[in-house]
Each structure stands twice: as C-alpha cells, then as structure tokens.
Curated annotation (Swiss-Prot):
EC number of this enzyme: 6.3.2.8
Protein name: UDP-N-acetylmuramate--L-alanine ligase
Keyword Cell division: yes
Enzyme class (EC, first level): ligase
UniProt xrefs under NCBIfam families: murC (TIGR01082)
Gene this protein is translated from: murC
Compartments in which it is found: Cytoplasm
Binding site for ATP: G128, A129, H130, G131, K132, T133, T134
Family as reported in the entry's similarity comment: Belongs to the MurCDEF family.
Length: 479
C-alpha cells in the first residue's frame, strides 16, 4: 500500500468523521499552542502547512519534519487547504483569513482543533493560572513510563525529548487548557486538573473574578458526569468551588485534609525529596529533580491523576527520577566564565508576580551562596497595571535588578504601567536599585554588575530568554 494510502487509512481509523479533511493550514504556526497540534496532525497523516510572521527555531523544526512553512502572511499560502486553524492572535483582517472566508473554508480556533482531537480520545486537560506546562509534562512522563504511550500537546518543550508534542499509540491525549482567552471552554475532556486559580487575564472576564471562577466551573462541567476533577485543595478559591463542580473530585496539597498529600519535604540543591500519602496506598518516598515547593504541587497534581489512571508507583518513581524539566521553566544554561569564577545562567518563563516569586524562592533555596541578579521583562501592559504593587514587592527581593521594556504582546501602552513606572516604585521602596536596560546597553551594564559567583535569571514570557541563550553560547554581553 502506498505511503499516502497508509496515511489516509490511519486517519480514517482514528477519526473517520474527519475524512473530508486532508489538508490543514495553521496561521501563526510558530506559537506554543499551535505548533504542537500541527505536529500531531502531521504525524497522524494529514497534510499540514502553516505560516508565521517571523522564522524561529520552532518553524525550522516543523519544516524539518515535513510541514510546509511560509514566513509572512499571504493569501496564496492557503492554496488547497481544507480547513484553516488560527491562534488567538490572528483576527479577520489577516490576508489568509480573508482569503479563507472568501473561499468559504472553515476557520477554526486552535482550541476548537484541540477539542476535536480530544473528542475521539480519553482526553486529560490541565488548566490553572500557574504550573500548567510543568504539570502536563510531569503527567505525560508518568503515563509514558507506565507504558500508556499518550499523545501530548504541551506549551513548552520537554527537555528530555526537545519536543512539545507527540502522537502516541494509546487512546490517551494529554493537553494544556488555556484560560487566557477562555478557549479552554471548547474542550470536553474525560478528566481534568486545575492547578490553582488567580487573577490573571482579567480583561477576558470583564475584570470580574467571579466570572473567571464561573468559567473554571464550566470547564470542569464540560467533562461527563463520570469524569474526574483533580484540584489543589490548598488553594482557598478552588476549595470553595468544589461543591459547585458536580463531578467526582480529588484534592492534592500539603494540608492533611487533601486526598493526596506531600509530607516530609527536604531540599537538596535543586532536588526536593518528599513522601506522598494517598488513600488505600502505601506511603511513597519520591525525589523531584526540579526545585521549589511550587513544583511539589505540580508533581502532586500529576501523581493524583496518574494514580487514578492506573500508573503504578514504580513508574511514578522512575518518571520523577528521569524528569529533566521543561524549556524556559527554571532552565539552567551552561555557566559562563567571568574573572576568577563563573556566573550561573537560569532562564524562566514566569511572568506573573506569583511565578516570579516562586522562581526567586527556588533559586535562593537551590543556590543560597550565589548573589541573585534578575533581568526581568514585563509581559503586557495590562498585567503590569493589574499586578503593579505585587511586582514591586516581589522584584524588590532580588540582589540586583535589570528591567527591560514591557513586551507588549500587541497591546498599546498604558500610562503608569511601563518599565519606568515600575523602576520608580521599586526605587522608592529602597531595597534594590533597579537599572533599566535595552538592547543597546545590555553589554556595559552586565559587565559592570555581574561578578564571579552570581546567578543571572532571565525572567519573562517575551524574548528575554534569547539573552540567556546568547550568553551561554558565546559569553555575549559579558566580554
């Protein structure tokens, strides 16, 4: 049988209802949520193409696996496509979207495409304000170690494989659920995790925390009545919502009332040792190779779900031993030599005050002897405005602070919510003297501030991570 015929047969067996669709085109394919779905569909035998405004490591990798990539948006890019998949950043003014609408092609959101993938599998969706990517990655690793071979779509790259998506051979699909634009309401999983809830992306919910909480309840009620909700019992807002979920619930946390509890936490460098207590199971002593109490919570969420899905303790133990973390989540790059010592480079994606605080605490815990120098890039003017006081408090706890301009993510500037305002308020607090840097003066500032024995953390969801890559590659900015 020809390869194309095999691919078609594979598609018809797995999703016969999608037999009319052969060619999918992704607009904004380089995005973290888009590239994973595109890769899964490509591996499933569909013809996949995509476009993005700029070339990146992601688009290069997708091209290497056979996906037709166009840089720039042009109506000709959608030729022969049967369906167009768009990220939340793409609107109807995009030339490819315009051409698709004129051709009466279906234009679907990324979450709707993920929802269709999930419809025909045992879907497990991971939602929450913080920790989604790490929790999804941990659960994927546990289920793979338990020989369940899941399909997965993750918002970051697994360091062990260098991938953020893969097509598995089993009925399981594990995926992140995005609350930022309420698109997680398009998913109908069999089981779901909510790591925590926080006031972020409030513009999506009319600046109403009650509407945000209602959306999470609706997300969990999208499961069948026999599904399972795994939620953090230590989060007071989540715990208060349990009675409204109307589905079976298991809680996890450090408090003794939880169904799954971690006790006896011991820190050893970047490792954390802890014991898991579960009903009807023997206590299980585990070692997590990534630092921070916040990651113990992420591990507990994954352990709770993995245990319910039948993963045994030996597989859970092996998974945690093998887990190498996720790209841009407290990712340690090679140290760079400076004077008579070195500077340790750490890169982290966290962009909310609670995430930044968790990074700082994990760094202090892991490397107490090193001075903490943070280069922070605020992400979105709206978040800077909404979390301004919390950012001031958290960022004041580092030893040296470098501030980049706000990464707008398409937003217009907001008065009093820019880097200068942030620096001014931090300076008035008096704990640390912030330095504003841009691409033209990074090198002299770094050369002046960094000392042997420091750790430099590049922090934020924008393009600040490239600085850590450049430093690790060639000591750029230091020498």
């Amino acid at each position: 049988m020809p390869t194309s015929a095999k691919a078609l047969t594979k598609r018809l067996i797995e999703i016969p209802e999608m037999r009319r669709i052969q060619h999918l085109h992704f607009i904004g394919i380089g995005g973290s949520g888009m590239c994973g779905i595109a890769e899964v569909m490509n591996n499933q035998g569909y013809q996949v193409s995509g476009s993005d405004i700029t070339e990146s490591l992601v688009t290069k990798r997708l091209a290497q696996i056979g996906i037709d990539i166009a840089i720039g948006h042009d109506s000709k890019n959608i030729a022969n496509a049967d369906v167009i998949v768009v990220s939340s950043a793409i609107d109807r003014s995009n030339p490819e979207v315009k051409a698709a609408l004129e051709a009466r092609l279906p234009v679907v959101r990324r979450a709707d495409m993920l929802g269709e993938l999930m419809r025909y599998r045992h879907g497990i969706a991971i939602a929450g304000a913080h920790g989604k990517t790490t929790t999804t990655s941990l659960l994927t690793t546990m289920m793979a170690e338990g020989n369940l071979d899941p399909t997965y779509v993750i918002g970051g790259k697994l360091n062990a494989s260098g991938k953020n998506a893969a097509l598995g051979s089993s009925r399981f699909l594990i995926a992140e659920a995005d609350e930022s634009d309420a698109s997680f309401l398009s998913l109908h999983p069999m089981a779901a995790i909510v790591t925590n809830i926080d006031q972020d992306h409030m513009e999506t919910y009319g600046n109403s925390f009650d509407k945000l909480k209602a959306a999470y309840i609706q997300f969990l009620q999208n499961m069948p009545f026999y599904g399972l909700a795994v939620v953090c019992g230590d989060d007071p807002e989540l715990y208060a919502m349990i009675d409204d979920i109307g589905r079976p619930v298991l809680t996890f946390g450090l408090e003794p009332f939880n169904d799954v509890q971690a006790v006896d936490l011991v820190t050893e460098g970047t490792k954390t040792h802890f014991t898991v207590l579960r009903r009807d199971h023997e206590p299980l002593r585990l070692t997590l190779n990534i630092p921070g109490v916040h990651n113990v919570y992420n591990a507990l969420a994954a352990i709770t779900m993995a245990t319910d899905e039948g993963v045994d303790d030996a597989a859970i133990t092996r998974a945690l031993q093998k887990f190498e973390g996720v790209g841009r989540r407290f990712e340690q790059h090679a140290s760079v030599e400076i004077d008579d010592g070195n500077v340790l480079l750490i890169d982290d994606y966290g962009h909310h005050p609670k995430e930044v605080d968790a990074t700082i605490k994990a760094a202090r815990q892991s490397f107490p002897e090193r001075r903490l120098v943070m280069m922070f890039q605020p992400h979105r003017y709206s978040r800077t405005r909404d979390c301004f006081d919390d950012f001031v408090e958290v960022l004041s706890s580092v030893d040296e602070l470098l501030l980049l301009d706000v990464y707008s993510a398409g937003e217009s500037p907001i008065a009093g919510a820019d880097t200068k305002a942030l620096a001014r308020s931090i300076r008035l607090r008096g704990a640390v003297e912030p330095t504003i840097v841009d691409k033209d003066n990074i090198a002299p500032v770094m050369q002046r501030l960094l000392k042997a024995g420091d750790m430099l953390i590049t922090q934020g969801a924008g393009n600040v991570g490239q600085i850590a890559i450049d430093l690790a590659a060639n000591n750029l900015y230091i020498k």
